[in-house]
């Protein structure tokens, strides 16, 4: 009986450990940190800079209260967003009409992502880091995470 209880306890611990190391279903997929052409500061130029968040899981996920942050401390907080399984939400830096879950707008009047080096951090509603994506490049304008 003691051997069975020990085996069950070990199985529970191993299952919990595997679950805690499983990759998150919500991930940063890509960052376009340098909009094409000159950085004019126009809304069109700002909106050509974006980050995509992908639901890699098998069910829809609510992102209410989740946050994206750059290294400088610019923060976007997701409102009431349901991201279907397998779908991507593109968060544009500038202003525009939100079409959740596909296109969201930060409504910033300045560029969020540094053209040379930056890091995006995705946090859930509890403030836990879910994913990070960093880049250090002058030869490309997009980072696949």
State where each predicted segment sits.
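Short amphipathic beta-strand/extended segments with alternating polar/hydrophobic composition
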Residues: 76-81, 128-139
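A structural motif detector for short, solvent-exposed N-terminal "entry" segments of globular domains
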Residues: 2-9, 16, 20-64, 109-115, ...
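Intrinsically disordered, low-complexity Pro/Gly/Ser/Thr-rich segments with frequent PxxP/GP/PP motifs
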Residues: 73-108
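Acidic glycine-/aspartate-rich tracts in secreted/extracellular proteins
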Residues: 56-59, 94-98, 125-129
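Short Gly/aromatic-enriched secondary-structure transition segments
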Residues: 64-70
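Hydrophobic beta-strand signal
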Residues: 52, 69, 90-92
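Extracytosolic low-complexity repeat regions of secreted or lipid-anchored proteins
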Residues: 100-134
């Amino acid at each position: 009986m003691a051997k069975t209880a020990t085996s069950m306890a070990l199985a529970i611990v191993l299952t919990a450990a595997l679950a805690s190391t499983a990759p998150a279903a919500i991930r940063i997929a890509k960052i376009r940190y340098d909009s094409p052409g000159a950085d004019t500061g126009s809304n069109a130029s700002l909106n050509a800079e974006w980050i995509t968040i992908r639901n890699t899981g098998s069910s829809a996920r609510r992102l209410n209260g989740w946050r994206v942050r750059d290294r400088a401390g610019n923060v976007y907080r997701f409102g009431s967003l349901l991201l279907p399984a397998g779908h991507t939400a593109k968060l544009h830096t500038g202003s525009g009409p939100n079409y959740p879950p596909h296109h969201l707008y930060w409504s910033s009047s300045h560029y969020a992502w540094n053209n040379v080096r930056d890091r995006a951090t995705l946090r859930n509603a509890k403030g836990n880091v879910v994913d990070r994506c960093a880049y250090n490049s002058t030869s490309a304008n997009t980072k696949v995470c």
